[in-house]
UniProtKB/Swiss-Prot annotation:
Biased segments, Basic residues type: 602-617
Coiled-coil ranges (or none): 21-46, 82-110, 559-619
Function: U6 snRNP-binding protein that functions as a recycling factor of the splicing machinery. Promotes the initial reassembly of U4 and U6 snRNPs following their ejection from the spliceosome during its maturation. Also binds U6atac snRNPs and may function as a recycling factor for U4atac/U6atac spliceosomal snRNP, an initial step in the assembly of U12-type spliceosomal complex. The U12-type spliceosomal complex plays a role in the splicing of introns with non-canonical splice sites. May also function as a substrate-targeting factor for deubiquitinases like USP4 and USP15.
Protein name: Spliceosome associated factor 3, U4/U6 recycling protein
Species per Swiss-Prot/TrEMBL record: Homo sapiens
Chain positions with Omega-N-methylarginine modification: R906
Superkingdom assignment: Eukaryota
Upper taxonomic lineage: Eukaryota, Metazoa, Chordata, Craniata, Vertebrata
Length: 963
């Protein structure tokens, strides 16, 4: 904030010495100076009223008429104005929208956007009472941003009339400064408190506000300066001998802190002070300048980056943590949270630092409370809050209420509810004095366990189709408490019986856990009984359970017990081995069946190939049948340019063309088609081949080249059509479309740019629709050198802010779905999943602004009907793809090394063509007989499809008789 009026002329010179500022920072500085001038007049007027005419206003550069300018400025800034509508229809429309928003909030009170829209409309309509209530309701649920608080404060200041209203505004300021660290709100608070200096205790109130503001944001490198100067401005306006020392003290405190514009502050102090500046102050000032140089790189990184600047703040936090100043660490965390309030990990790190280092009750609990208000969907924040309240001795009733709020927070996973219940049950267990046989706390703990099991079964299973606790961890903990702390093994056994009936009886580790509990707190009889049941039920590791049973009987059992145990284990293991053998035989049969099918397919392909070869020999004039027609995957309706229409008419003479009619569809309409004679077609194909020279791939240009695929095969002149698209990314050197031997476009090409940044920008055009198909754009990579290189632009892990929607009608458009999703939050991105032909698959991914909106959307949209289709909505969490195992070679008996058949990450592909040499696929056969002599080894009989059967003398005789 600016200095006194007489030093305002030196501001430009001081500003030139300041550190670098971004454009936004310069605007803030200008705004701060404007507020400082208003503050000067407000301070002068208030001091005049307090001290009377004895104070010389002209000496301080303030006129008497400026006394009420602060109130006028505040009113002009914040007054919403009187909106006059030209049409009553618009006002009625706003009223209907207000009613709709109120109804929506009655259904879902956690809809942040609805609160904001309702406040905006009520303020627009001038409903001051209703807008105040709406703001209060929102502030109880969510922390408000600096803009929302300033708007609310300005409205309340403009309506304040007397001292009672001023106290109400003070209370509002106190709430505002608790949500986030806001230098502008503290500045407004100080300015407003100056206006009440004439009231009883007004002077002490102003100083208290400014001192608290300095404690909160006085260390702020870029915005703390305004508060220091505002405080000095206030003290300088009160001309008393005792106050001069106060101004000296403020100057010395400020100069000892590394802040921007320190040189200007030092120059101002030299000009203001009549005495020489003490040496200790100069030393502290020089030390602060040195510290400023260390902080400048981090501050400059923040100024140059764009919000939310999480990475820059993380680096700044790490730097402050190394230095270890608690005040500065707290400040940088608060600054980071202003822009990253929806990042749970940042809240967790901040609260963890406070829990372990500062341990100040009010500060710790305040941060935990703000954390759950900002990220209510994060169960870790709620669990940490319960622990912090217990750690600082908060009343049990308050902790219970907080836990009930956590259950209504809307967690996005079933396991989150298990975690919060476990945290609360741990707290209740620590309250119980188990030395007493019965107590109120113990009964409350047992009731909580019972309620937890019912809640997971009814509420959680109904919502997520799973309890979130398949291993029954809560019941296991309850059983341990009953057995170890309450000496109630009967209850523990009942709980374990219930655990086993929930699908856990087949797991050896569950039985061994129960056995260990019986071993520690039960008796041998129940241990033996548990192991006998385990032997009969376990299916994953029966050998281990059998070994434990035999070990127990060996050390504690009688001969009869030993015989029974041996008999049961042998019977069980024999049955298990029999089942395993049957399963292995079944699997081997399936493998053999697959191999037989593969052999049949192979034989059929060989027969087909031999037949084509025979036809080719018989009719050399016909077109080669072994040329494959390239068919687009998933696009059965698109006609390929390589296909020829059969024409029943005779072939015209050479050099002529004939106009024939070809049936165009079931309607019976015919279309005239010009058919060229074969000679011209051959000439045209030959010319196409001559016009398309082969270009060797230059791997040195891979960085400036992109590979474009999935283009329509029917695309005419790909270069002409694709060049305008890619020239938007930068200068295109050439486009190399790939054609077949017949001159047909094969659906992919290479685009070479002049600069590498253009190629990187072109990758953003991936999935862009071209002639109705999604165009794939990927980096140009030599697959022979990088066989594992894959490009997938979307995340394959859990994304809590993104939804996966299935069951959509194929006719649903992106705009229609976006309109539905917008009702539940801000949609950042929406993607309809299509196949290669561009046709929808009934799936979509919707990305929301934060996890809270996504969680609410799941609850509201799951099971919704869209165009008679019931959709399913869930948090995006794609299943893990199977990673192919590393191939290993195996050697066939008496043959060469064999390579096992391997598949990609998605399993078998559509094209089951083996690209391995035949010599590696089966035992090598002897080479066929050479042209000039016999082979080195006897030939192995080839399949019947590829070699004619051997004929006897009788067969040859029959052939001669036929003639």
């Amino acid at each position: 904030m600016a200095t006194a009026a007489e030093t305002s002329a030196s501001e430009p010179e001081a500003e030139s010495k300041a550190g670098p500022k971004a454009d936004g920072e310069e605007d803030e500085v200008k705004a701060a100076r404007t507020r400082r001038k208003v503050l000067s007049r407000a301070v002068a007027a208030a001091t005049y009223k307090t001290m009377g005419p004895a104070w010389d206003q002209q000496e301080e550069g303030v006129s008497e008429s400026d006394g009420d300018e602060y109130a006028m400025a505040s009113s002009a800034e914040s007054s919403p104005g009187e909106y006059e509508w030209e049409y009553d229809e618009e006002e009625e429309k706003n009223q209907l929208e207000i009613e709709r928003l109120e109804e929506q909030l009655s259904i879902n009170v956690y809809d942040y956007n609805c609160h904001v829209d309702l406040i905006r409309l009520l303020r627009l309509e001038g409903e001051l009472t209703k807008v105040r209530m709406a703001r209060q309701k929102m502030s109880e649920i969510f922390p408000l941003t600096e803009e929302l608080w300033l708007e609310w404060l300005h409205d309340e200041i403009s309506m304040a009339q007397d001292g009672l209203d001023r106290e109400h505004v003070y209370d509002l300021f106190e709430k505002a400064v608790k949500d986030y660290i806001c230098p502008n709100i503290w500045l407004e608070y100080g300015q407003y408190s100056v206006g009440g200096i004439g009231q009883k205790g007004g002077l002490e109130k102003v100083r208290s506000v400014f001192e608290r503001a300095l404690s909160s944001v006085g260390l702020h490198m870029t915005k703390g300066l305004a508060l220091w100067e505002a405080y000095r401005e206030f003290e300088s306006a009160i001309v008393e001998a005792a106050r001069l020392e106060k101004v000296h003290s403020l100057f010395r405190r400020q100069l000892a802190i590394p802040l921007y514009d320190m040189e200007a502050t030092f120059a101002e102090y030299e000009e203001w002070s009549e005495d020489p500046i003490p040496e200790s102050v100069i030393q502290n000032y020089n030390k602060a300048l040195q510290q400023l140089e260390k902080y400048k790189p981090y501050e400059e990184a923040l100024l140059q980056a764009e919000a939310p600047r999480l990475a820059e703040y993380q680096a700044y936090i790490d730097f402050e943590m190394k230095i270890g100043d608690p005040a500065r660490i707290q400040l940088i965390f608060e600054r980071a949270l202003v822009e990253n309030c929806l990042v749970p990990d940042l809240w967790i790190r901040y609260s963890q630092y406070l829990d372990r280092q500062l341990k100040v009750k009010d500060l710790v609990l305040s941060v935990h409370n703000r954390a759950i208000r900002n990220c209510p969907w994060t169960v870790a924040l709620w669990s940490r809050y319960l622990l912090a309240m217990e750690r600082h001795g908060v009343d049990h009733q308050v902790i219970s209420v907080t836990f009930e709020k956590a259950l209504n927070a809307g967690f996005i996973q079933a396991t989150d509810y298990v975690e919060i219940w476990q945290a609360y049950l741990d707290y209740l267990r620590r309250r119980v004095d188990f030395k007493q046989d019965s107590s109120k706390e113990l009964e409350e703990l047992r009731a909580a366990f019972t309620r937890a099991l019912e809640y997971l079964k009814q509420e959680v299973e109904e919502r997520f189709n799973e309890s979130g606790d398949p291993s029954c961890v809560i019941m296991q903990n309850w059983a341990r408490i009953e057995a170890r702390l309450c000496n109630n093994m009967q209850k523990a056994r009942e709980l374990w019986d219930s655990i086993m009936t929930r699908g856990n009886a087949k797991y050896a580790n569950m039985w061994l856990e129960y056995y260990n509990l019986e071993r520690a707190h039960g008796d041998t009889q129940h241990c033996r009984k548990a192991l006998h049941r385990a032997v009969q039920c376990t299916s994953d590791y029966p050998e281990h359970v059998c070994e434990v049973l035999l070990t127990m009987e060996r050390t504690e059992g009688s001969l009869e017990d030993w015989d029974i145990a041996v008999q049961k284990t042998e019977t069980r293991l024999a049955r298990v081995n029999e089942q395993r053998m049957k399963a292995a035989e079944k699997e081997a049969a399936l493998v053999q069946q697959e191999e037989e099918k593969a052999e049949q397919r192979k034989r059929a392909r060989a027969e087909k190939k031999a037949l084509k070869k025979k036809k080719k020999i018989r009719g050399p004039e016909k077109r080669g049948a072994d040329e494959d027609d390239e068919k687009e995957w998933g696009d059965d309706e698109e006609e390929q340019p390589s296909k020829r229409r059969r024409v029943e008419n005779s072939i015209p003479a050479a050099g002529e063309t004939q106009n024939v009619e070809v049936a165009a569809g079931p309607a019976g309409k015919c279309a005239a088609v010009d058919v060229e004679p074969p000679s011209k077609q051959k000439e045209k194909a030959a010319s196409l081949k001559r016009d398309m020279p082969k270009v060797l791939h230059d791997s040195s240009k891979d960085s400036i080249t992109v590979f474009v695929s999935n283009l329509p095969y029917s695309m005419q002149e790909p270069d002409t059509k694709l060049r305008p698209l890619f020239e938007a990314c930068g200068e295109v050197v050439q486009i190399r479309p790939i054609f077949s031997n017949r001159g047909d476009f094969r659906g992919y090409c290479y685009v070479e740019f002049k600069e590498e940044k253009s190629a990187l920008q072109a990758l953003e055009m991936d999935r862009k629709s071209v002639e109705g198909r999604p165009m794939f754009v990927s980096p140009c990579v030599d697959k022979s050198k990088n066989p594992d290189f894959k490009v997938f632009r979307y995340s394959t892990s859990l994304e809590k802010h993104k939804l996966f929607i299935s069951g959509l009608p194929f006719s649903c458009t992106k705009e229609e779905l976006e309109e539905i999703c917008k009702a539940h939050g801000t949609v950042k991105d929406l993607r309809l999943v299509t196949n290669r032909a561009g046709k929808p698959k009934g799936l979509a991914y919707v990305e929301y602004e934060n996890e809270s909106q996504a969680s609410q959307a799941v609850m509201k949209m799951d099971g919704m009907t869209i165009k008679e289709n019931i959709i399913k909505v869930a948090i995006s969490n794609p299943p893990q793809r199977k990673v192919p195992e590393k191939p290993e070679t195996r050697k066939a008996p008496g043959g060469p090394m064999l390579l096992p058949q391997t598949y990609g990450a998605r399993g078998k592909g559509r094209t089951q063509l083996s690209l391995l040499p035949r010599a590696l696929q089966r035992p090598s056969a002897a080479a066929p007989q050479a042209e000039n002599g016999p082979a080195a080894a006897p030939a192995v009989a080839a399949p019947a499809a590829t070699e004619a059967p051997k004929m006897s003398n009788a067969d040859f005789a029959k052939l001669f008789l036929r003639k």
